[in-house]
Amino acid sequence: INISELLSSDFLVLDNFSLSSRKGIETVEYSLQIKDEVRVCFGLSDTSLIQENYENLKKIFLNKIDILFGNEAEIIKLQEFISNPAMNTLVSKGSKGAKYNQINIEASKIDVVNSNGAGDALIGAFLAYTDFLEDRLALSKAVSYATKVCMINGPRLLT
């Protein structure tokens, strides 16, 4: 682990797949040790991993990570086991948009070509804007970007 790179980051973005290997668990544990210096975000990734990784998830959420993100089903599944797991929560609501804490933004109605990468686009764009814009505008721009990703065949917009 390159400590100086981690410490120079605005956010550390980790996910539930990280908890599927010993090295991944070590990386997550280390990241939580420096959470006072770098904001930590954690993605739930898949509902099946929530129960599978429950013991490690409990350790993570005792640390009150900065932003938890996932889709509605993942957030609901997690709440069956752990309540109030993060300081902030970003929820992807699919074609209905997204929610950040108490802020809801609806997505534009489109013909979806492929939703692959939309969740990653949502969190990536939101994090890119969150330090520069107020939360509602950052979320609005993130939903707009994720919507555009759904209009192409692939997870990235070509520039």
Which sequence ranges carry the predicted segments?
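Conserved post-catalytic alpha-helical subdomain immediately downstream of the catalytic base
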Residues: 108-159
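Ribokinase/PfkB-type carbohydrate-kinase core domain
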Residues: 1-103, 158
